[in-house]
Each structure stands twice: as C-alpha cells, then as structure tokens.
Amino acid sequence: MHQPILVAALLLVSLVLENRRKERRFDIIEKLKKQFEIKRVIDLSYFEKESVFLEGTGSMILDRQNKICYAALSDRTNLIALNDFCNRALYNPVTFKSYQKVEGKINLIYHTNVMMCIADQYAIVCLETIHNTKEREVLISSLEKTNKEII
C-alpha cells in the first residue's frame, strides 16, 4: 500500500467571475484528500459574498523560501483577503499598486503575475508600473534582503 504524499495546505480562493467559481468542485477536493495527506484547508471563498477577492496565483507571487507574499492590490487582489491568507499561511505581505495604460486610461494591473515573477535567485519585476516611490522601494528592499537579483 502506498503512502499519501504530504501536502501542507489546500487553498480555496475567492474569484470575481461566476463561471470560474463553478470550477471549484468539492468532489475533486474530496478525491485529493484521499490521495494526499492534506494538513489543512484554507478556504477564502466566503469572501465572494462580500465582493472581496483574492484570485490565487494570479494575485499573489509567493516566495515560499522566505515566506513572503508579493501582491499588486486591485479589485481582484483585496488587502483584507490577502492579510487573511498571510495570517493563516504565515506569510509576510509586501503590497503595492501597479498600473498599466490601456486605451489611453491608467488602470490598476489586476494580477500581480502580469508584472512580476520570482525564482530561487532572482525576481523579474516591471518596477516602472509601481508609481508610488515608497511602495517601489519597499519591494526592492524586500527582494534585496532575500538576495534576489532584480531583473
């Protein structure tokens, strides 16, 4: 008999789009629980009732090694939901607002993974999208403290 693979946590996020919410299938979650040893489930889906969203890996760039969560705040990356996740998962949040120009209008970038990714030794970041100097400096400082080369 095989031993189940240990998975520390299963994260259920709050999603803006109704059709994406339907993809959250509890029958699959139950199968996962049988095949993997899941220590806990972090369920943030209840935020949907309050129109508060945190859309998972699009919203958050996780530096798992250093337990830091980088997030560009937007309608799809809410600070309250983000702080709830960080408190439960024991991550330190680094937040900022990131902007892009679309059809002549300046809009928030709604997913952090549009402007940032992180690896063991480096981070690719479009720093120009962070207009607030203090927020940009906090992000740079965090990456430098964790010895990430900024590309």
Where are these regions (language model features)?
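The feature marks the mature, well-folded catalytic cores of soluble enzymes
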Residues: M1-I151
